[in-house]
Each structure stands twice: as structure tokens, then as C-alpha cells.
Regions:
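Bacterial Sec-dependent N-terminal signal peptides
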Residues: 1-29
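Short S/T/G/P-rich N-terminal loop/turn motif that feeds into the first structured element of a domain
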Residues: 21-110, 115-116, 120-234, 244-263
Length: 263
């Protein structure tokens, strides 16, 4: 599976480079993000995943000079049959993403610390499925930002949103609304503490964009969104004819950072 993943990254790199080359030249600092979603079913799989992330994956990525990696679990895990864990990793380029994912496979410390996960038997896998989403940061939010929060990790609410559009052209309109239209600056003014805003360049629900905002707790989250929908600037922006019907479906996932997560 790892070999197939590297081939996918290589192909993606070639295609995305051609598609994004002009944009990248104008915005050389825009990051790429890899978001992995692990589906698991029980505490045994969760333990293997946590051990692998904490003692193998994050240290290996840190040795590759990736400073901040986010590891989160879905708040709904307590009652959900399909439980979820997320790993968010920022990269300077698709080439770096491909190279780092390749290099850690030759890291002896990584292979030793992650052996239970890496060498799992076919009938005792550490997860049921794994999704990989590749994202490209928005021009107005070219680099990830660390949340400025004071609450304990088990109280925080990280809100991951995915906005799907009906067609590529309509999707481009929604991306324009976030950037030139002023939606990103509005979120910043209202202190939504966003980690990233991005367009998905490889994933299962395209065309779509994804972004993550963070809050001290659920009560603060509710208060922030109430302020947002009542804001005069949002009312004006959302009523503009050119921005109508540019989102077809929204997925909202509430997450909490694991204690060993970098943010």
C-alpha cells in the first residue's frame, strides 16, 4: 500500500505542478497539507494508532524538519461505530511531501518504534480504512497558524469544515469568495483562530475546500458563529448575486487534539 501511495504522490505532483505552476510562482509561500483520516472500530486499534503516532510518526516527521503536526480525534468517537482520528501535516511543496513520506520509511528509529503498526497482520489491521486528502493553502492564508488558546486540550473544539460545490467553475467562485470576496478576513476579524484555509486538490469529495477553526470550548464556538451570521459584512457578502448557490454540501466535524499533538 505504501508503494501505491508513493506512486500516487508522484503522479499527483506532476499533475498538480502543471495545474498550479502559475499560481505557485505568484504565491511561492503557499503550503500544501496532507490530511490523513484513520477509521477504526475499537480500543485495541486506537491504542496501536496512538502509540504509532506518538512514538514513531511524529518523531520521524520532526527529524525531517516538519515542526508542527496535528493529531486529533473526533469528539463523536465515544458514541460512533466508525471512529476517526486525523493527522494533519504541512509541507512547503508537493515534492517535499513525497520525499518526506519516502524518507521516513528508511528511518530505523521510526521502523523500530512503529513496528506493531507497520508490521500488523492482515487479519489484525490497526485501522479499518485510511483516507488521504491533499490540500493547497489559500492565497490569503498561505501558511498554517497555531491556535492561540489557553484551555486544556480536552476542552478545546477544533472545527473541520468541508464545502462541496456542484462543479469546478462554481467551486472556483466559492474559493474567490473566501479570498478576494473577503470571507477569510472576516473570520480573522472575528477571531476564529483558524489553523488553515485550503482547496482540496486530491480527495474523495471534490470539488471542495476545507478549513479548520479552533475554540476554547463548545460554548465559545457557538458564540463565535452567532456573531458571524449576524455580522453586517457577512450579511452583505452572502447576499451578493455572484455568490449564490456556490456550496452544495457541507460536512462539519468536531475534533479535539491528542495530548501529544503539536497543537
Amino acid at each position: 500500500m505504501k508503494r501505491k501511495y508513493f506512486v500516487l504522490l508522484a503522479l499527483l505532483g506532476a499533475v498538480a505542478f502543471a495545474a498550479n505552476d502559475a499560481h505557485a510562482q505568484k504565491n511561492p509561500d503557499r503550503e500544501y497539507y496532507e490530511l490523513k483520516i484513520y477509521h477504526f472500530k475499537d480500543s485495541a486499534q486506537e491504542k496501536i494508532l496512538n502509540t504509532y503516532f506518538q512514538f514513531a510518526l511524529l518523531p520521524a516527521l520532526h527529524r525531517q524538519k516538519i515542526e508542527y503536526i496535528g493529531v486529533f480525534k473526533a469528539i463523536a468517537n465515544d458514541t460512533a461505530a466508525d471512529k476517526l482520528m486525523y493527522v494533519f501535516t504541512p509541507f512547503k511543496s508537493l515534492k517535499e511531501m513525497q520525499q518526506v513520506n519516502k524518507d521516513i520509511m528508511y528511518d530505523k528509529a521510526y521502523n523500530a518504534a512503529g513496528s506493531v503498526y507497520l508490521d500488523a497482520a492482515y487479519n489484525k489491521p490497526p485501522y479499518t480504512r485510511m483516507e488521504v486528502i491533499i490540500l493547497y493553502a489559500f492565497p490569503l492564508a498561505p501558511k498554517m497558524q497555531l491556535p492561540q488558546l489557553r484551555s486544556a486540550a480536552n476542552e478545546r473544539v477544533y472545527e473541520l469544515r468541508s464545502y462541496e460545490s456542484a462543479t469546478e467553475k462554481i467551486f472556483a467562485n466559492k474559493v474567490q469568495m473566501f479570498n478576494e470576496g473577503g470571507e477569510v478576513p472576516l473570520f480573522k476579524r472575528l477571531n476564529f483562530n483558524a489553523v488553515f484555509y485550503s482547496e482540496v486538490i486530491a480527495g474523495a469529495h471534490m470539488p471542495n475546500l476545507m478549513y479548520m477553526t479552533t475554540f476554547e470550548n463548545m460554548q465559545e464556538r457557538e458564540a463565535h458563529w452567532k456573531t458571524f451570521v449576524e455580522d453586517a459584512e457577512w450579511k452583505k457578502l452572502s447576499s451578493m448575486p455572484e455568490y449564490q448557490n456556490n456550496v452544495q454540501h457541507i460536512d462539519i466535524t468536531f475534533l479535539r487534539p491528542l495530548l501529544y499533538s503539536d497543537f
